[in-house]
UniProtKB/Swiss-Prot annotation:
Name of a matching Pfam family: PC-Esterase
Alphabetical list of InterPro entries matching this protein: TBL_C (IPR026057), TBL_N (IPR025846)
Span(s) of short sequence motif DCXHWCLPGXXDXWN motif: 530-544
Highest taxon in the source lineage: Eukaryota
Protein name: Protein trichome birefringence-like 16
Biased composition regions of type Basic and acidic residues, renumbered to the chain: 95-107
Protein source organism: Arabidopsis thaliana (Mouse-ear cress)
Ranges annotated as biased composition (Polar residues): 78-89
């Protein structure tokens, strides 16, 4: 009895001990779990505080992207920094290029060549000498020199190294891309914004023109457009671009106005332009799209009215019709009330082209990729605002048809990489922009612009294979251009780091496919449409409005 009684307390003690130990273990486990939860919660809260809300928004790449049919190569180079005196000529400039002008943009073997990974190395010598070009094996890069004056080779080498990272190779990443955003689910309600939007203080932020990126924005309807009549501006406007004189019946495209994002653009007025350009000269140098911009500007200044007082001063700039030629190398007109001159010079490739044998009408022509047009070398000192462009004539059909032979350093090009048309074009753009930049210190009042590529809109083929652009509803409906950099990559890289400004019109023009001459051309062959040039009045007027705001 005593044994039983004595054992019972002991058992109970052991039992209580075990229960207490189990409770402690459970409490320790609960505390551990709470600590783990607390640590995780702390990490989550800390991460949330350090992460901006914008990180959870969809990236810009989710915006709708429109792929242009026109490819923009991106192999930048820069070279010639010679002074204009190196190439000066005392004789008047006469256009040596083929007189016929069309919208041809053959690509035949060009596209295959441009798919190669290209490498071109430009080695600048001392100022005043033509740079040499050599192929570098094993390196997929182009060394683009900064177009600035240098005293020592070491500084030049430093500049060359600095811009290496800006150079791209090949064509794969060079396709023209336009970033746009849907701004309204109802296209009509968006595009049919009234011109009251212009004066609404809440519609645009009032920031300075210098800070405005005019390439960003949207197209809206303005009841005050167009700025001139396409049927009345016959003094300046070629009939092949005056769609009012054709069989086209829809002209809603004439009423669209470009509205930059977050800033206002100064209204264009002919009288205001002439006052701003008093005793100055505006020069357009480029291809047929440059000529369209020139004719647009003349119509905008005059309001489409006949101006008998305007003087033809073409001979002052060497614009004479060569013997047997169809037209001069350009046109120049002067508004006497302000002594303002507006001119256009035909230079489809923006480089120097000269006959190899001046006595032979059938001779080949040297196409000097590293020399600016002879016109610029001779008349730059007379120009106050310069607008350059090139692009659509860089195809095998043009080169072969005009008997143009690529030259570098004064001799035929032997660099097979540079012979690819995409590389040759970009090489030339960088060369000419670099040369103009080197001239800016010599002409402090000169404002120079390079206009980006005007897009083509051929659908279902090319200009000679059934390509068309019959759309009459603009792609701009309900969309807004948002990209920061130009769709024309080559143009953007060419002007970077120079005093030459970019007149970026590619993206805003890309969403205006309805503005081309299309099938209504009065000179086109049956079945051939013009989806390269624009109806005037039209999109090129906006290019000039932006130019006016920038000068």
């Amino acid at each position: 009895m005593n044994e039983t009684f004595s054992a019972t307390p002991r058992s109970m003690t052991i039992h209580r001990y075990r229960m207490k130990r189990g409770a402690l273990r459970r409490r320790a486990r609960d505390i551990s779990v709470m600590l783990v939860v607390l640590v995780c919660a702390t990490v989550v809260i800390w991460t949330w505080d350090r992460t901006p809300t914008s990180a959870f928004l969809p990236p810009e790449s989710h915006y709708l992207k429109l792929q242009s049919e026109e490819k923009v190569e991106k192999l930048p180079t820069a070279l010639n920094t010679e002074t204009k005196d190196s190439y000066s000529s005392a004789i008047p400039f006469v256009n040596k290029e083929e007189s016929k002008e069309d919208s041809s943009d053959n690509k035949d073997t060009e596209e295959e060549e441009e798919k190669q990974v290209e490498e071109v190395t430009v080695s600048n010598t001392n100022r005043g000498k033509i740079p040499t070009i050599e192929e570098k094996k094993g390196e997929h890069e182009v060394i683009a020199s900064e177009p600035k004056y240098r005293k020592t080779p070491t500084r030049e080498d430093f500049k060359l190294e600095k811009v290496k990272h800006e150079v791209a190779v090949g064509e794969g990443e060079a396709t023209e891309t336009t970033h746009i955003k849907e701004t309204n689910s109802d296209p009509k309600s968006n595009i049919l914004a009234t011109d009251e939007e212009r004066t609404d203080g809440t519609s645009t932020a009032r920031i300075t023109n210098q800070a405005c990126n005019y390439a960003k924005g949207k197209w809206v309807v303005d009841n005050h457009r167009p700025l001139y009549s396409g049927s009345q501006c016959k003094q300046w406007l070629a009939s092949m671009w005056a769609c009012r004189l054709m069989q086209r019946t829809d002209f809603a495209f004439e009423s669209l106005r470009w509205q930059p994002k977050d800033c206002s653009m100064e209204e264009f007025e002919g009288s205001k332009f002439l006052r701003r350009m008093k005793n100055k000269t505006l020069a357009f140098v480029g291809d047929s799209l440059g000529r369209q911009q020139f004719q647009s500007m003349m119509c905008m200044i005059s309001g489409g009215k006949e101006r008998l007082d305007v003087l033809d001063v073409g001979p002052e700039f060497g614009f004479i019709t060569p013997e047997g030629g169809a037209r001069p190398g350009g046109w120049a007109y002067r508004f006497p009330e302000t002594n303002t001159t507006v001119l256009y010079h035909w230079s489809s490739t923006l480089c120097d082209i000269e006959p190899l044998n001046i006595t032979d009408p059938a001779t080949e022509h040297a196409m000097h990729l590293d020399r600016p047009p002879a016109f610029l070398r001779q008349y730059l000192q007379k120009i106050d605002v310069l607008v350059m462009n090139t692009g659509h004539h860089w195809n095998r059909g043009k080169l072969n048809g005009n008997k143009w032979v690529m030259h570098v350093n004064g001799v035929p090009n032997t660099n097979r990489k540079l012979a690819a048309l995409g590389n040759a074009k970009n090489f030339t753009i960088h060369s000419t922009v670099s040369w103009v930049n080197s001239q800016l210190p010599l002409h402090p009042g000169l404002k120079a612009f390079y206009r980006s590529l005007s897009p083509r809109h051929f659908v279902g083929g090319e200009w000679n294979t059934g390509g068309s652009c019959n759309n009459t509803t603009p792609m701009s409906i309900g969309k807004e251009v948002l990209q920061e950099e130009s769709s024309d990559y080559s143009a953007g890289r060419a002007v970077k780091g120079t005093g030459v400004k970019l007149l970026d019109i590619t993206a805003l023009s890309h969403i205006r496919d309805e503005g081309h001459i299309s099938r209504f051309s009065i000179s086109a062959s049956r079945g051939v449409q013009d989806c390269l040039h624009w109806c005037l009045p039209g999109v090129p007027d906006t290019w000039n409005e932006i130019l006016f705001a920038m000068i």
